[in-house]
Amino acid sequence: MTAQEEFQRFFDTIKALRAPNGCPWDKEQTPLSMRNDLIEEAFEALDAISEQNPEHAKEELGDVILNATMISYMYEQE
């Protein structure tokens, strides 16, 4: 699977979470309600990078990507 195909699969998962039959919690979220989560994940990623802990950094950067992509999709839905 190419990187583009993998990202599309990831994005399709986000769309499914926000769909009418998706996750109730995800459907209730707004960019503003997710703002603090994005900030927290970014700081956690920075801490992991500062600690020079690649595995932890990858995990936290994944969380940043998830939050940023979710928020971007929310704006796309408007």
List each model region and its residues.
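Extended low-complexity intrinsically disordered regions
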Residues: 1-57
